[in-house]
């Protein structure tokens, strides 16, 4: 695979290999057959980052070969959304005549949506001044006249210039409802929107008919919390990143959801609060004891759950666990399956043509 070509004819084979690998990893935990969710074979990634190479008055996107470290010119990138591919040449054509915008530009980041909004971040090794801002405004307006619903941001060391705002609003059809998600530049969002929809719908299906409340750790912008709210009486969710918390609060309002409460704190801190080890001012006005959470949802970073959080989640009758790293999931399952059994397993091909897998498990307490 190169940046400009995809081995689409090998898609089924690579998915079968991942399925077999996941089944082998999960065999010792007596997991059921996985449900397998396919990705679109191209234009599936909603964000992309490119370094910029300057050649005299010309410039172009590049990536680096992971083995040889050689640079590769990238004019089209079929991994990324069609919107990103349309904007890539249009943006460079608009940049070339403007030395102020070109000079010391070393990276361009794109974040697109299925709702055809896109935010572009231009990263520089220089100070950004008023002249840069004026030319950036002209660049933004020129691209908008070409039909791009675009937000433009300039970044340099300790500097962020946002011409309008630094987010896009995604709209996803999830199990018969349109869900609005504000996605903030430089914050985590699910990269494969089509797979995100399938993950949300799978999570809804395996929690259908739930009783009581839901606790979510690592909620981000509320991606899962808000979709799952329809299956629970109340949802209590934690997130540490301030921009993600702000986006989640907006998303609660935009989706007119009244049963979700977001708390800004780390999962480790929340564990301490639940155990009564520490008191936090951030929890003032929130009666943790009033929640009857029979289900806990976790979508941790690649490192998985720390030991203390594993012990916390074991206290809940049902654990819904989304993992972007099955190896750390299995490490956690070695402990979790002492008290719970794996009742559902899913493979989401979030990262086609790569070694990486995303999977989901539902664990239910042994009787």
From Swiss-Prot:
Q: Which GO terms describe its cellular component?
A: cytosol
Reaction equation(s) it catalyzes: uridine(54) in tRNA + S-adenosyl-L-methionine = 5-methyluridine(54) in tRNA + S-adenosyl-L-homocysteine + H(+); uridine(341) in tmRNA + S-adenosyl-L-methionine = 5-methyluridine(341) in tmRNA + S-adenosyl-L-homocysteine + H(+)
Is the Transcription regulation keyword given for this protein?
A: no
Report the active site residues: 324 (nucleophile), 358 (proton acceptor)
InterPro entries of this UniProt entry?
MeTrfase_TrmA_AS (IPR030390), MeTrfase_TrmA_CS (IPR030391), SAM-dependent_MTases_sf (IPR029063), TrmA_MeTrfase (IPR011869), U5_MeTrfase_fam (IPR010280)
Among the GO biological process terms of this entry, one is: tRNA methylation
The residues the record assigns to binding S-adenosyl-L-methionine are 190, 218, 223, 239, 299
- EC number in record: 2.1.1.-, 2.1.1.35
Alphabetically list the UniProt keywords. Methyltransferase, S-adenosyl-L-methionine, Transferase, tRNA processing
Q: Which GO terms describe its molecular function?
A: rRNA binding; tRNA (uracil(54)-C5)-methyltransferase activity, S-adenosyl methionine-dependent; tRNA binding
* Superkingdom of the source species: Bacteria
Entries under HAMAP family matching the protein: RNA_methyltr_TrmA
Return the PANTHER family for the record: TRNA/TMRNA (URACIL-C(5))-METHYLTRANSFERASE, TRNA_TMRNA (URACIL-C(5))-METHYLTRANSFERASE
Q: What does this protein do?
A: Dual-specificity methyltransferase that catalyzes the formation of 5-methyluridine at position 54 (m5U54) in all tRNAs, and that of position 341 (m5U341) in tmRNA (transfer-mRNA).
Q: Record's family?
A: Belongs to the class I-like SAM-binding methyltransferase superfamily. RNA M5U methyltransferase family. TrmA subfamily.
Q: What is this protein called?
A: tRNA/tmRNA (uracil-C(5))-methyltransferase
């Amino acid at each position: 695979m190169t940046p400009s070509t995809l081995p689409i004819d090998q898609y089924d084979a690579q998915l079968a290999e991942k399925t077999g690998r996941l089944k082998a990893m999960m065999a010792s935990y007596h997991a059921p057959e996985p449900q397998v969710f396919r990705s679109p074979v191209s234009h599936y990634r909603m964000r992309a980052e490119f370094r910029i190479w300057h050649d005299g008055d010309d410039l172009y996107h590049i990536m680096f070969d992971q083995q040889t470290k050689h640079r590769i010119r990238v004019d089209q990138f079929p991994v990324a959304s069609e919107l990103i591919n349309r904007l890539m040449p249009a943006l460079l054509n608009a940049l070339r005549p403007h030395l102020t915008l070109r000079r010391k530009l070393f990276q361009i980041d794109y974040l697109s949506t299925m709702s055809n909004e896109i935010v572009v971040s231009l990263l520089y090794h220089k100070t950004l001044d008023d002249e840069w801002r004026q030319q950036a405004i002209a660049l933004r307006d020129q691209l908008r006249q070409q039909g791009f619903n675009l937000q433009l941001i300039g970044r340099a060391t300790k500097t962020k210039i946002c011409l309008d705002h630094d987010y896009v609003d995604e709209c996803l059809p999830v199990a018969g409802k349109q869900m609005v998600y504000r996605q903030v530049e430089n914050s985590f969002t699910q990269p494969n929107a089509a797979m995100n929809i399938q993950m949300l719908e799978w999570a809804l299906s395996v929690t259908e008919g739930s009783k009581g409340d839901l606790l979510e750790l690592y909620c981000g912008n509320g991606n899962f919390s808000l979709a799952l709210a329809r299956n629970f009486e109340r949802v209590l969710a934690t997130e540490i990143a301030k921009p993600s918390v702000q986006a989640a609060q907006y998303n609660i309002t935009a989706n007119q959801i009244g049963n979700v409460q977001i708390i800004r704190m780390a999962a480790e801190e929340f564990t301490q609060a639940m155990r009564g080890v520490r008191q936090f001012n951030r929890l003032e006005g929130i009666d943790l004891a009033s929640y009857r959470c029979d289900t806990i949802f976790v979508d941790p970073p690649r490192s998985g759950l720390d030991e203390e959080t594993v012990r916390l989640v074991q206290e809940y009758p049902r654990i819904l666990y989304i993992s972007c790293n099955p190896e750390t999931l299995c490490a956690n399952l070695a402990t979790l399956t002492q008290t719970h059994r794996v009742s559902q397993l899913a493979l989401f091909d979030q990262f086609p043509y790569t070694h990486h897998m995303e999977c989901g498990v539902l664990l239910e307490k042994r009787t």
